Structures are given as structure tokens and as C-alpha cells.
From Swiss-Prot:
Pfam families: Hormone_2. It comes from the Eukaryota. Belongs to the glucagon family. This is Glucagon-1. Keywords: Hormone, Secreted. It comes from Huso dauricus.
Length: 37
């Protein structure tokens, strides 16, 4: 039971981490596109 809770928390943590990385990637892409123009 506690193992399931841990896995659930861990997957939530991974999702948040992925979302933050995605936002950073978007920001980097935006600045690169603006720098090119």
C-alpha cells in the first residue's frame, strides 16, 4: 500500500518535472526564434 502511494507521488513528481522542462524548452525556442529574426 505504501509502495503504491510512493509510486503515485513519484509519477506526479515526474510529470511536474517534465512540465517544467517543457516550459523551459518553449522559452528557449522562443528566444532563439526572436534572435534569428
Amino acid at each position: 500500500h505504501s509502495q503504491g502511494m510512493f509510486t503515485n507521488d513519484y509519477s506526479k513528481y515526474l510529470e511536474e518535472k517534465r512540465a517544467k522542462e517543457f516550459v523551459e524548452w518553449l522559452k528557449n525556442g522562443e528566444s532563439k526564434r526572436q534572435g534569428m529574426s
